[in-house]
Regions:
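Catalytic domains that recognize anionic headgroups
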Residues: 1-135
Length: 135
């Protein structure tokens, strides 16, 4: 078995960078993310910029690494061009097991955002439902 790192890729939608404790906010707003980032093998990125003002276009850019004007998601329709590779597809081709845990309806096979994930777990938006789903 190959010795390679586990990769946990976390994105947050509609969250202010300067209001997260992982980035120094005085209130402990993101304790779990801070613990992960503070590990010797943890990392955070301070220069991440949304490439669209709407979640779908930004999410497409995050998952593909290309600008909305190139991937065109959300312009004509809400389907990612099958010729555009996602980060999950790249990890899958490299032999990683890929799992997406999301409450975002756009992460699906129908939109193309789900391509490359071995499993997609849809997490409910209500806290009690999240506990029941995880349990």
């Amino acid at each position: 078995m190959e010795n390679r790192p586990n990769v946990l890729f976390v994105t947050l939608d509609s969250v202010r960078h300067d209001h997260t404790s992982v980035h120094g906010y005085e209130r402990d707003t993101t304790p779990s993310l801070r613990r992960i980032a503070d590990r010797p093998d943890g990392a955070t990125f301070d220069s991440c910029i949304a490439h669209g003002k709407h979640t779908p276009k930004s999410s497409a850019s995050i998952l593909t690494g290309i600008y909305p004007s190139v991937h065109r998601f959300g312009y004509e329709d809400n389907t990612l061009d099958p010729d555009i590779e996602t980060i999950a597809e790249r990890f899958s081709k490299a032999g990683y097991r890929t799992v997406c845990v999301s409450n975002n309806a756009f992460v699906s096979e129908e939109t193309g955002f789900g391509r490359g994930f071995d499993d997609i777990v849809v997490v409910p938006k209500e806290p009690l439902d999240i506990i029941q789903t995880a349990g």
